[in-house]
Design a protein with these regions (language model features):
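FAD-binding core/adjacent interface of flavoenzyme oxidoreductases
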Residues: 3, 75-165, 172-176, 245
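FAD-site-proximal beta/loop scaffold in flavoenzymes
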Residues: 121-145, 238-306, 310, 314
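C-terminal auxiliary extensions adjacent to catalytic cores
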Residues: 339-379
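Internal hydrophobic alpha-helix adjacent to the cofactor/substrate pocket in enzyme cavities
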Residues: 17, 172, 301-327
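Beta1-alpha1 glycine-rich phosphate/pyrophosphate-binding loop at the start
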Residues: 1-76, 156-198
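A Rossmann-like FAD-binding core segment of flavoenzymes
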Residues: 32-36, 75-92, 100, 174-270
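Flavin (FAD/FMN) cofactor-binding core of flavoprotein oxidoreductases
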Residues: 194, 227, 324-341
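Glycine-rich, N-terminal phosphate-binding loop of Rossmann-like dinucleotide-binding domains
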Residues: 9, 96, 109-110, 235, ...
Length: 379
């Protein structure tokens, strides 16, 4: 029997597992191939929903389903914490000592926000990257009566356009509550332009200007003083705030560090086209877990899962697994509460947002609902 273990049951892990079981249904049903997903959570979460939770446009329950329900019944689900990966012995060791051998391993451990890495952010600010954070931000917005709103961005972080979406949704949300004239919004970004993607930066500049949103670049948040309500950057600039919203920096999963497989951020060195872990021909990496200099987004994991699933299936059947990932990413961008745009790009083509509109916003909402078909490997 050939064994494929998928470490991580998030977007990338679920998609790659469900795609493989569909493509290998004969081998799986015959007991020739076994697929196992390791998940350290019981609930599968559609994390982009938390942005809508912050504006009271969704509830957390809309974003969650049991992990067992997300996976095909023929996929073995191991719920628990993986202690480490041992590539030399071709196995994953669980925290309870269970050993899971593999012929192929897919690392899809994702990323996690670490707001504590910015001094004072936990005590003095808010974010929307977890259920708890989104609910606290929702409460803060509901009681907000005006003042200075400052958004700061830590790097790296998942969903590259989320800071822009929050600011543009906030602007329209404040206008709808009659608070626009009483509020000053300040958008900061850690590099010398408004976004890491040049095309997105060029697009959003005039959009922010038309809405009267102040922008500060080269602003890397270092210290937040919750009492004085100030945030000071690594560059030495200090801004005052009445409401501070942060995009927390992210790290890879601790199992990567315990296994000695990653860099200082727990990102796994990965070939940009084959998605094989560098130095191994039996370990694939996808989604946020890679060290690739591309957007950490759900669509990235999806497009990579297509390649990884097809290549593992091909190799299990005696082929070479020669499909290549081209760096494709697709992101909707909410430009308010009722309009959106999108960008698509890859290693060769830079992003260029199209004109925003209400129809694209409806597409975005439809995509949110169809996410569960995506994880099932149907879309």
């Amino acid at each position: 029997m050939k064994r494929v273990v998928i470490l991580g049951g998030g977007t990338g892990g679920a998609i790659v597992a469900n795609q493989m079981v569909r493509q290998l249904h004969q081998e799986v049903d015959a007991g020739e191939v076994e697929l196992t997903v390791i998940s350290n959570v019981e609930q599968h979460v559609y994390q982009p929903s938390f942005l809508y939770v912050a504006f009271d446009l969704a509830i957390p329950a809309d974003a969650k389903r049991p992990e067992r329900q997300v996976l095909d019944r023929r996929i073995h689900l191991v719920e628990g914490e993986a202690d480490r990966v041992d590539p030399g012995q071709h196995q994953v060791i669980m925290s309870d000592g269970m050993e899971l051998p593999y012929d192929f391993l897919v690392i899809a451990t994702g990323s996690r926000p670490v707001p504590e890495d910015i001094e004072g952010l936990v005590e003095g600010g808010h974010h929307f990257y977890t259920e708890e954070g989104a609910l606290k931000l929702r409460d803060a917005l509901q009681s907000f009566k005006g003042g200075r709103v400052v958004l700061v961005v830590g790097v790296p972080h998942k969903c590259p356009v989320a800071p822009l979406e929050f600011i543009l949704m906030l602007h329209e949300w404040l206008d709808g509550r009659g608070l626009s004239s009483a509020t000053h919004i300040v958008y900061t970004y850690p590099i010398g332009r408004l976004h890491s993607l040049q095309g997105v930066a060029e697009w959003v500049g005039p959009v922010f200007e038309a809405r009267g949103i102040e922008c500060r670049t080269f602003f890397n948040p270092e210290i937040i003083d919750p009492v004085a309500r100030t945030v000071t950057s690594l560059e030495g600039e200090t801004l005052s705030y009445d409401l501070l919203v942060g995009v927390p920096p992210h790290l890879g999963h601790d199992v990567i560090a315990r296994s000695g497989l990653g860099d200082s951020g727990n990102w796994v060195p990965t070939d940009r086209h084959s998605l094989l872990m560098q130095g191994r021909d039996d370990v694939y990496v996808l989604g946020d877990a890679t060290n690739l200099p591309i957007s950490k987004a759900g669509s990235t994991a999806h497009f990579q899962a297509d390649v990884v699933a097809a290549n593992i299936v091909n190799r299990l059947r005696g082929g070479y697994g020669s499909l290549r990932y081209d760096g494709k990413v697709f992101c909707f961008i909410e430009t308010g509460l009722n309009e959106a745009t999108y960008v698509t790009f890859d290693y060769e083509r830079p992003p260029a947002p199209v004109a925003s509109g209400s129809l694209l916003h409806l597409y975005k909402l439809a995509f949110n609902r169809m996410y569960w078909l995506s994880t099932a490997g149907i879309l």
